[in-house]
């Protein structure tokens, strides 16, 4: 009687289970912990049109994330989007008023970021985890130092969508977060209304 086939089948099943456990562990290890639970930003203390001049500062990247080349590359790309999306808005506002007066500083800062580059997406796929970025933007009265608003913004690219689009969704995330900032800025020019953050009420659903 041949007992070899059943034993081989048992080993195969055990190997499959171990492989599944290993994959789940790898996915858990790559889970992105960057999240934002708030869905809406409060209105600024005054509408932005109360100022005569506007200055858009360069993006600051939190020091904890400066060491990673992929994060630095993503920061440069976000900066490019600020130049093409936000800078024209600021320039247009500055042409409306020739009078000297108060100046509003716009200071974007990346608080947290995890960016999966195209190389990692090709070689590792969804096991690299999701991409995510969390930003704060300070709107400050240049003369008095008063903080007029400090909204937070969040975007992510899910691991599977990033992998199946070969990194397109990861890169599109960088464009989307600048779109959120631009929309908040323009919507609060004529009246202080606040705006969406891009976060989710149940941030636990964004762990991977």
Model-identified regions with their sequence ranges:
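Hydrophobic h-region of N-terminal signal peptides that target proteins for export
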Residues: 24-30
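Alpha-helix N-cap and loop-to-helix initiation/capping positions
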Residues: 74-78, 125, 169
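Bacterial N-terminal signal peptides that target proteins for export
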Residues: 3-19
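A structural "domain/chain start" motif
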Residues: 30-84, 116, 152, 183-208
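Ligand-binding grooves and catalytic loops that recognize ribose/phosphate and carbohydrate rings
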Residues: 90
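Surface-exposed short loop/turn segments
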Residues: 32-36, 93-147, 157-168
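Extracytoplasmic/secreted envelope proteins and their assembly/folding machinery
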Residues: 79, 83, 87, 134, ...
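Short secondary-structure boundary motifs at beta->alpha junctions and helix caps
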Residues: 67-72, 146-191
